[in-house]
Amino acid sequence: GTEYTAPHILIETGGRPKKLGIPGEEYALDSNGFFALEEMPKRVVFVGAGYIAAELAGTLHGLGAETHWAFRHERPLRSFDDMLSEKVVERYQEMGMQIHPNATPAKIEKTAQNEYVITFENGESITTDAVIFGTGRQPNTDQLGLENTKVALDEKGYVKVDKFQNTTQNGIYAVGDVIGKIDLTPVAIAAGRRLSERLFNGQTDLYLDYNLVPTVVFTHPPVATIGLTEKAALEEYGEDQVKIYRSSFTPMYFAL
């Protein structure tokens, strides 16, 4: 192969959909497969508690598919405040989506009628036209040859970096999904810009603060957050230092 050398090398190889390792998982689609669909399934089961499953389930349900959303724990979107994830589930159920909490997939089988049956560890099974996994992503670090460097990875394969995006090898940096902090494209861009300003424009103290990044999940309705969740704030500052305010309102008649 061709050898390249440089004083600065940036790892920004992103991630890929994570497999569950269950029998019959080859019958399931991931987020890439979802966007390759040529026709809409009439019945669909989404598995996963994060952004991908939440958004895509809402999309197909809104288009008229019989939609099931299954996730391993009591509630989805667990990095958000309870009140937000509860509202998403409540609204989806009002719209007719079928929600399956505490449902861990055990296997997927294909029938003679070209249908799929997904069975969960709790014994529940659902017959459907498509199963779509939104069960997280894993970093693309396993084929980079990092074992030939001093770049350290964590137990999940993410590149370890400090607040300046430095890895444990001088001259090698990493940003984006490959570091496992906040897997959002604008965050990777912002981190990369700050890194380039630091390396090439003399702003030696510039770095991205990952603690105050706004994020939105495009569910129906969409939900957004920034900063600490209520639980995290209470754990960090104590109940006597945290005040919780809640407000609700009726949407305007002319609102879209």
Named regions from a protein language model:
Residues 35-36, 41-45, 51-115, 119-121, ...:
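Rossmann-like dinucleotide-binding cores of NAD(P)H-dependent redox enzymes
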Residues 224-256:
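Structured beta-strand/loop patches that form or line metal/cofactor-binding pockets in enzymes
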Residues 25-41, 125-202:
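FAD-site-proximal beta/loop scaffold in flavoenzymes
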Residues 177-184, 218-219, 250-255:
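Glycine-rich phosphate/pyrophosphate-binding beta-alpha loops
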Residues 1, 121-123:
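Glycine-centered tight beta-turn/hairpin loop motif at sheet-sheet or coil-to-beta transitions
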Residues 16-18, 152-153, 202-212, 239-245:
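A short alpha-helix-loop-beta-strand transition element characteristic
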Residues 3-14, 45-47, 67, 126-136, ...:
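Short hydrophobic core segments
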